[in-house]
């Protein structure tokens, strides 16, 4: 029996999306879905939910939960990763509250920035442990990573383990649809070309019937900027740098040195920047889960429609050899010629029989590559820190971060990092 293992299966809604999609995929009939999570209650809830979907849609699939990660991984062909090390409490709270003491504010803190750095430092060692188990139990399996920070985690796996890894994110697949909806434009029939890095890839070309749509996009965007809306940071970046970025304004507000600034507090209101957005989302998600738990977990009539997630389609392509094209995160093996070779880039990829082939993207416009490099610098130093476990490398990663370095002195950055080390405690390995 072929096997898909889901690590972090206690994320019940996400497990429903990804594994629910797999249940609706004929090519995956007869598979085992192996569930693993460190929270036994959430694991049981996900199993009950998936069993209800299985009974309704695909009785040929076996749903099994494991409290032993190695057994969950044994003979798996595919491993889906959706873990969050340290969770909302204590780790996310720490990532936001300690920087606030230094006057450093954040919105999401899951990619770069000081929060993204420490999320990477917590998570990379756990992924290395998973990789070690995979090398023993399922060395030929594909590792589909959905966990952020995408670039650092995927890069660490690709550079320091033998596991075949692809990083998957939602931003590319919704980029132009959301843009066109916001501007009141028709999305059907467009052709697009996107490349860059995760959460900072660029809509390089967008055409319909051979006509470049960027002039009309920019005209409408400039008009829309005259009133407040939720995507003002991205439109500002497009106005100044010429291209639209894939990830949301709340994310990009903290990837650059321009937007969250103590000396320009008016920018928060002018550009509708939602400070502390991610902690608010966490609280709301927890509250919503309490309300919907019973209807999701114990509902014998639970339904599912195939979602926009890439996971099931990639696995289907590998099983059937029917190609599937998607935006994936891979090592930059000459794919984007003016970005570093150690960087993880987000480019068009094609999945087919047991492999994923990334597509050549060429040279980015120089201003876009320059913006990408500012984040890549921090990403590469963060991986270096996680591998060497040297505090000095952590300090350097933080000092290279665009937002952190624009707001704090070197002395304060080092002090803040030391406070974060102390607060995270055993969620981090020992650094020297």
UniProtKB/Swiss-Prot annotation:
GO biological process, one term: carbohydrate metabolic process
Stretches assigned to coiled coil: none
Catalyzed reactions per annotation: Hydrolysis of terminal, non-reducing alpha-D-galactose residues in alpha-D-galactosides, including galactose oligosaccharides, galactomannans and galactolipids
Binding site for Mn(2+): 169, 199
Stated induction or repression of this protein's expression: Repressed by the transcriptional regulator MelR. Induced by melibiose and raffinose.
Active-site annotation: 170
InterPro entries: GH4_Enzyme_sf, GlycHydrolase_4_CS, Glyco_hydro_4, Glyco_hydro_4_C, Lactate_DH/Glyco_Ohase_4_C, NAD(P)-bd_dom_sf
The protein's Enzyme Commission number: 3.2.1.22
Note describing how the cofactor binds: Binds 1 Mn(2+) ion per subunit. Binds 1 NAD(+) per subunit.
Pfam family membership, one: Glyco_hydro_4
Binding residues for NAD(+): 2-68
Keywords: Carbohydrate metabolism, Cytoplasm, Glycosidase, Hydrolase, Manganese, Metal-binding, NAD
Chain residues that bind substrate: 148
Subcellular location: Cytoplasm
Cofactor(s) listed: Mn(2+); NAD(+)
GO terms of molecular function: alpha-galactosidase activity; metal ion binding; oxidoreductase activity, acting on the CH-OH group of donors, NAD or NADP as acceptor
CC terms in the record's Gene Ontology section: cytosol
Subunit structure: Homodimer.
Family label: Belongs to the glycosyl hydrolase 4 family.
Its biological purpose: Catalyzes the hydrolysis of melibiose and alpha-galactosides of the raffinose family of oligosaccharides (RFOs) such as raffinose and stachyose. Cannot act on polymeric substrates such as locust bean gum.
Name assigned to this protein: Alpha-galactosidase
Organism: Bacillus subtilis (strain 168)
Name of the gene: melA
């Amino acid at each position: 029996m072929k096997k898909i293992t889901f690590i972090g299966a206690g994320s019940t809604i996400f497990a429903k999306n990804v594994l629910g999609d797999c249940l609706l995929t004929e090519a995956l009939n007869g598979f085992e879905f192996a569930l693993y999570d460190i929270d036994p209650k959430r694991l049981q809830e996900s199993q009950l939910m998936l069993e209800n979907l299985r009974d309704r849609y695909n009785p040929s699939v076996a749903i099994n939960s494991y409290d032993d990660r190695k057994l969950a991984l044994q003979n798996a062909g595919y491993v889906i990763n959706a873990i969050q090390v340290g969770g909302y409490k204590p780790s996310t709270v720490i990532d936001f509250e300690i920087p606030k003491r230094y006057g450093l504010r954040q919105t999401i803190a899951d990619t770069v920035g000081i929060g993204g750095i420490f999320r990477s430092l917590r998570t990379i060692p756990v992924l290395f442990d998973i990789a070690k188990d995979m090398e023993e139990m399922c060395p030929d399996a594909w590792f589909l990573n959905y966990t952020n920070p995408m670039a650092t985690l995927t890069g660490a796996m690709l550079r320091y383990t033998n596991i075949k890894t692809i990083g998957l994110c939602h931003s590319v697949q919704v980029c132009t649809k959301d843009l066109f909806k916001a501007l009141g434009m028709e999305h059907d029939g467009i052709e697009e070309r996107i490349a860059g890095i995760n959460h900072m890839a660029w809509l390089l070309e967008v055409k319909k019937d051979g006509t470049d749509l960027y002039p009309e996009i920019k005209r409408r965007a400039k008009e829309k900027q005259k009133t407040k809306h939720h995507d003002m940071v991205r439109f500002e970046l497009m106005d100044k740098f010429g291209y639209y970025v894939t990830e949301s304004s709340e994310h990009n507000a903290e990837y650059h040195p321009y937007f969250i600034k103590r000396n320009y507090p008016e920018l928060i209101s002018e550009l509708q920047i939602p400070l502390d957005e991610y902690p608010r989302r966490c609280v709301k998600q927890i509250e919503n889960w309490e309300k919907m738990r019973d209807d999701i977990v114990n509902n014998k009539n639970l339904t599912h429609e195939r979602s926009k997630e890439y996971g099931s389609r990639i696995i289907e392509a590998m099983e059937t050899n029917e190609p599937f094209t998607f935006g994936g995160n891979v090592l930059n093996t000459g794919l984007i010629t003016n970005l570093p070779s150690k960087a993880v880039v987000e480019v068009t990829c094609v999945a087919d029989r047991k492999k994923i082939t990334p597509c050549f993207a060429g040279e980015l416009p120089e201003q876009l590559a320059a913006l990408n490099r500012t984040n890549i610098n921090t990403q590469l130093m963060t991986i270096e820190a996680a591998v060497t476990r040297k505090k000095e490398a952590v300090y350097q990663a933080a000092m290279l971060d665009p937002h952190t370095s624009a707001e704090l002195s070197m002395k304060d950055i080092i002090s803040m990092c030391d406070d974060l080390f102390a607060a995270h405690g055993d969620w981090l390995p020992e650094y020297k």
